[in-house]
Amino acid sequence: MPELPEVETALRGISPYLKNFTIEKVVVRQPKLRWAVSEELITLKNVKIVDLTRRAKYLIIHTEKGYIIGHLGMSGSVRIVPQNSAIDKHDHIDIVMNNGKLLRYNDPRRFGAWLWTENLDDFHLFLKLGPEPLSDEFNAEYLFKKSRQKSTALKTFLMDNAVVVGVGNIYANESLFICGIHPLKLAKNLTLNQCFSLVNTIKDVLRKAIIQGGTTLKDFLQPDGRPGYFAQELLVYGNKDKPCPKCGGKIESLIIGQRNSFFCPKCQKRG
């Protein structure tokens, strides 16, 4: 599933081809995604794009009339292609621009979404989101306060979008390993010092992943068709039974909150 670094990579890749250009039309070949494609988007024509931003794992395309909200789901990707490009099997949406290019959305599993709103402030999917992990609002004091009374496995806690958005499974695994904290540690047992370490590490891991263009394990591609190269930097994620890069012991895995978790039992003591 594309997480924050992958969505940020997508945003940076598509922005130069969309910002300050005009949408001529939107071609929807498959409207049945996680939620039906908004009717306002299907009928959108001759509207200028004034900005592109991101909130959590949502792409936000700002137009003169409102906002296109895109979510890549489990297997979605966006790319910029010439208007005469051949259509692949899972190319569900084209946003056709007045510069000879189009934004093409491909999604084999169709768990993504393309919606429309005229007001971001009360957009229903944004109302309960936590702070951005790279913002000043996400700090040790915030994490410490938020974790009190939470009898939840720490990795599950870090992946809760009401706590902090966009960390995701890969980056939670990597951050906990670097900090030497077991993924099953209860969130309420975090010390303030551990919160300082976790916050700084999460920010560092996410920034490095963005620089590398995200992580490609299966479906994700950057808008120019290249994979994300952070997969080559992964220390524990997907490395079950391989030697720990710190101690040489064997990396183990378990299921936490229905997600694969990878850790070193020697370097990440439970407690």
Curated annotation (Swiss-Prot):
Cite the binding residues for DNA: H90, R109, K150
EC number(s) per UniProt? 3.2.2.23, 4.2.99.18
Zinc finger FPG-type: from-to:
235-269
Query: Annotated Gene Ontology MF terms?
Result: 8-oxo-7,8-dihydroguanine DNA N-glycosylase activity; class I DNA-(apurinic or apyrimidinic site) endonuclease activity; damaged DNA binding; zinc ion binding
The alphabetized UniProt keywords are: DNA damage, DNA repair, DNA-binding, Glycosidase, Hydrolase, Lyase, Metal-binding, Multifunctional enzyme, Zinc, Zinc-finger
Keyword check for Zinc-finger: yes
Q: Which cofactor does it need?
A: Zn(2+)
The alphabetized list of GO BP terms reads: base-excision repair
Q: Which NCBIfam families match?
A: fpg, PRK01103.1
Q: How does it assemble?
A: Monomer.
What's the protein name?
Formamidopyrimidine-DNA glycosylase
Q: Which organism is it from?
A: Haemophilus influenzae (strain PittEE)
